[in-house]
Design a protein with these regions (language model features):
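Primarily EF-hand calcium-binding motifs
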Residues: 584-599, 615-627
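Acidic Ca2+-chelating loop motifs
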Residues: 596-608, 625-636
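N-terminal cap/lid subdomain of alpha/beta-hydrolase-fold enzymes
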Residues: 42-54, 97-194, 478
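Alpha/beta-hydrolase fold catalytic core
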Residues: 322-467, 479
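Catalytic histidine-centered segment of alpha/beta-hydrolase-like enzymes
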Residues: 495-505
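Alpha/beta-hydrolase fold nucleophile elbow
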Residues: 217-230
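C-terminal motif of bacterial Sec signal peptides marking the signal peptidase cleavage site
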Residues: 14-17
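A catalytic-pocket lid/entrance helix-loop region that shapes and gates access to the active site
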Residues: 142-146, 240-340
């Protein structure tokens, strides 16, 4: 066996956290005050492990060998020299650390910056069952595919260009694939499907983030999560778990959210809830396509949406509820909806509680529009309409071919395995969470803020997204109180992947940079300094092997439910005292996970053994009586004293 690999496996299985080269997690290169020196990388190698996305698959012998390369990027007046680190890192259980899963990741770290103060952001897509190729190659990494959205005539494959809107000038970037996607796989005796559920998925992501932080000396770094689509409920649960485990986070970016499956009418086949929150998005799409009356210029879109929000809530929604009870809508409402959205009055009369699938099929006769981006249109019978969503089909080939060539040619990582862009995990996914059959993660986000009142949330939304409509997200977040000092909500031209639109991406980058700079714990961080000059460095040589083409195991539609669940009935969202009780329940369940020997009391040792770092790190302050054990009421009092406002009195 290769001695490097043998060492990596031994380190992986024996240590919960290590600081050596086995982790390979992207330490910075010398040249900056407080910076560390990355040891020379190993020689060129092809990762000979065979990775599988199958539900019954698992990895017998993980390794943590990495490919390390040097690059530069010009943003504005600054040239940023950075290190790319590609490979696997093992997530360990909190209690009695044992290997769970081997996560495939790509980290980009700024040369010369101090890891103690430099922000680090963890990116992931959703699905569930989607690899992070979309955020990695489309959003704020150092390179991106130039898609020119919403055009459907841009030559493909798209040009792969330096990304002048990258977030690398404000944060180190870690793109990580979920278990059973990309090259990430469970470690035996676990199986991939062991982690295919709302709760277990968030738990194993927690363990990856904590391991990465420990291996790479990032405990004091400002830390951010950046999840898209299903990645947003993952983020809400994950940030609560991280805070409870004692890993304090600085911020969460929610890209195109579905925080509560139960509030999104587009998730279900049997529409038992009002689709009112989609109406502003319908109007935005109709306006872009020139179908509304009177016409609405693109520059006036925010003002148009400001009119459509109250109309959807105060006029359309009550009419839908009356329609569900048997009262036909008035002709006035139907006529106004037709003018506002471009959908015919006849279609509104026939399908008054209009779901996005019907809108997608019927807005443009003879054509389909995109779900991910309603501005994209394809005539039925053409290749672009073959998978029923031109805003997915048009991008798939370029993203799938580029990830393979980029990994091998630029980042010097190869494996004989197939990179899985979308697995079939969703067909067996356990969506239940906190007693509900479909996740409502607004209470989890509130519980995280209760533990860390300084946590800040950035919600990014596309006006033309027909999968996770922006007004639905506004309603979900409004349950936490509006205005809420912890939460900022932002809107952009574009669809689900706002960053594919050049205008939307530039605006989002500017607002994200301001968000990072304004967060309390990053004000002293090296957030926007140019990199130090690149130091002499022996890169991992480019391997001679080639990789198979990337694969889609199923048609991409994120977020969604499998057919077996789409006919079930959602649960109405909680508000007020009921919501606060749910927040308390989330925190109580974490407290109870310590399984205290004395009912209702947890000792310092029990908190540590259970991985409850929040309690362990603050134990003396929580234990005001000096009893050597604390109750959940003691923990709540401590949270309130630190500014928590989402807990019951």
């Amino acid at each position: 066996m290769d001695t490097r690999r043998a060492f990596a496996i031994a380190a992986c299985l024996a240590l919960a956290a290590c600081g050596g080269s086995g982790g390979g997690g992207g330490g910075t290169t010398g040249g900056g005050t407080g910076g560390t020196t990355t040891p020379p990388p190993p020689p060129a190698y092809t990762d000979s492990n065979t990775y599988s996305s199958g539900g019954s698959s698992s990895l017998a012998s993980p390794n943590e060998i990495t490919a390390v390369t040097k690059h530069s990027l010009v943003i504005g007046a600054n040239t940023l020299n950075y290190t790319a680190t590609v490979g696997h890192l093992t997530a360990m259980t909190l209690a009695n650390p044992t290997p769970e899963a081997s996560f495939f990741y790509i980290a980009y770290t700024l040369d010369g910056a101090s890891p103690g103060t430099r922000p680090v952001t963890f990116f992931y897509n959703g699905g569930p069952g989607s690899a992070t190729v979309w955020l990695h190659l489309g959003s704020f990494g150092p390179k991106r595919l130039a898609t020119n959205a919403p055009s459907t005539t841009t030559p493909t494959p798209f040009a792969f260009v330096d990304n002048t809107e990258s977030l690398l000038d404000v944060s180190d970037l870690v793109f990580v694939d979920a278990v059973g996607t990309g090259f990430s796989e469970a470690i035996a005796p676990n199986l991939n499907r062991t982690f295919w559920g709302t709760d277990v998925d968030a738990q194993v992501f927690r363990d990856f983030v904590m391991r990465y932080v420990a291996v790479n000396g990032r405990a004091s770094s400002p830390k951010f999560l950046f999840g898209e689509s299903y990645g947003t409920p993952r983020s809400s649960i994950l940030v609560n778990l991280l805070e409870s485990a004692g890993t304090q986070m600085t911020g969460v970016v929610l890209q195109s959210s579905i925080l509560n499956y139960n509030s999104n009418c587009g998730v279900f086949d049997t529409v038992t809830i009002s689709c009112y929150a989609y109406v502003p998005s319908y109007a935005a799409v109709g306006a872009w396509l020139g179908l509304v009356t009177p016409p609405q210029p693109v520059a006036q879109l925010p003002a148009y949406m400001a009119l459509m929000r109250p109309y959807a809530s105060n006029v359309y929604d009550p009419a839908v509820r009356a329609w569900m009870a048997g009262t036909a809508p008035s002709g006035t409402i139907v006529t106004q909806l037709a003018a506002d959205t471009g959908m015919s009055a006849g279609n509104w009369s026939a399908h008054f509680n209009m779901d996005p699938g019907y809108f997608h099929d019927n807005l443009v006769p003879g054509s389909v529009i995109g779900f991910y981006d309603g501005r994209m249109v394809a005539q039925r019978g053409t290749p672009l309409a073959a998978d029923d969503d031109p805003s997915s089909t048009f991008y798939n080939d370029s993203f799938s071919s580029t990830i393979v060539s980029y990994l091998s040619n630029d980042l010097h990582y190869t494996t004989p395995s197939t990179y899985t862009i979308s697995s079939n995990a969703i067909n067996v996914w356990d969506f239940s969470h906190a007693g509900l059959q479909f996740p409502d993660t607004v209470p989890d986000l509130a519980a995280a803020i209760a533990q860390n009142p300084k946590l800040e949330v950035f919600s990014a939304n596309g006006y033309h997204d027909l999968v996770t409509p922006f007004y639905n997200t506004e309603g979900d977040l409004a349950r936490l109180g509006a205005p809420n000092a912890n939460i900022s909500v932002h809107f952009y031209e574009g669809g689900h992947m706002t960053y594919l639109d050049d205008v939307g991406r530039q605006q989002e980058k500017a607002e994200l940079a301001a968000f990072y700079a304004s967060t309390a714990s990053t004000k002293v961080a090296e957030a926007a300094v140019p990199a130090a000059p690149s130091q002499p460095f022996a890169e991992t040589p480019r391997p001679t092997g080639t990789m198979p083409a990337a694969a889609f195991e199923m048609k991409l539609r994120d977020p969604m439910l499998p057919p077996s669940l789409r006919g079930l009935k959602p649960t109405p969202p909680s508000t007020g005292d009921a919501l606060r009780a749910e927040v308390e329940q989330r925190l109580q369940s974490l407290f109870d996970s310590a399984r205290p020997k004395r009912a209702g009391l947890v000792t310092l040792e029990e908190a540590r053994a259970a991985g409850l770092g929040y309690i362990a790190n603050n134990f003396q302050a929580i234990d005001t009586r000096g009893a050597g054990a604390v109750s959940f009421d003691d923990v709540k009092r401590f949270m309130r004293a630190r500014g928590a406002t989402t807990l019951p009195n």
